[in-house]
Design a protein with these regions (language model features):
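Acidic, surface-exposed loops and disordered segments
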Residues: 1-239
């Protein structure tokens, strides 16, 4: 499965089975975690049993069940691009999980941050978590949620400001962004294409917009075949 196919196949799953993740798959996932931590200076951790962050928590409103394995997305508080990096590298890890027939879901607020799932240093910030594991077939509730989300994807014309006809690579990138998860499916990222230069920006709402920004960038780069400069208004470099 390619990354593009993983983007097409990914769904945000909330109901997990107790089936453990195989050792060989965990090894592959950990190799990517190590590589991305080194590249980004993040401190992503895989937690085999993070169920305490969800067990008996009213904040999850019953949407999450059977959560066990987690990616804990954390990094240095002083990192100006922390949340963007978390979104970017976290989504790359999600896609690797999808390619191994696992499922995942971004969780920013519906978990117990006071649970002792991981020990952080004073200089680190826990941004969010990503449950990972095996799931049953889509439940009726999940199908309804996915149908509602799919029907609310932001139209490309509302994502893009451009003074020319949209080139094919840009269109493909934006289509991939439409499939990117975001808080309440808000899809806050704005792309501007002027004088042959593409830039991406987002309003920093102090919550999860910058995480969504990183997720959107990862999807765009895979489909658009290039790389964004880090930060708001970073330019896209076509490869």
């Amino acid at each position: 499965m390619t990354n593009l196919e993983a983007i097409d196949n990914r769904r945000s799953r909330r109901l997990y089975l107790p089936t453990p993740i195989e050792v060989d798959k965990l090894a592959v996932l950990q190799s990517f975690i190590d590589a991305y931590n080194k590249e980004s200076n993040l401190s992503i951790r895989f937690v085999e049993d993070g169920s305490a962050a969800f067990d008996g928590l009213r904040k999850s409103y019953g949407l999450f069940k059977g959560v066990r394995s987690l990616l804990v997305m954390a990094g240095k508080k002083e990192d100006a691009n922390l949340k963007e990096k978390v979104g970017y590298y976290g989504e790359l890890l999600v896609l690797e999980a999808i390619k191994m027939d696992l499922e995942a879901c971004w969780v920013g607020g519906s978990f117990d941050r006071k649970s002792d799932i991981v020990e952080l240093t004073d200089s680190e910030e826990l941004v969010c978590v990503i449950p990972i594991g095996y799931t049953e077939k889509l439940s009726f509730k999940e199908k309804m949620v996915h149908q509602m989300v799919a029907g609310k994807s932001k139209p490309i014309e509302k994502m893009l400001v451009s003074d020319v006809k949209t080139p094919r690579w840009l269109l493909e990138g934006l289509k991939a962004v439409q499939k990117a998860p975001s808080a309440v499916n808000h899809q806050p990222v704005l792309f501007e294409f002027r004088d042959g230069v593409l830039k991406a920006s987002v309003e920093d709402d102090g919550k999860f917009n910058l995480v969504d920004f990183g997720i959107a960038k990862s999807h765009f780069e895979i489909a658009g075949q290039g790389r964004f400069e880090p930060g708001n208004n970073g330019k896209f470099i076509k490869l």
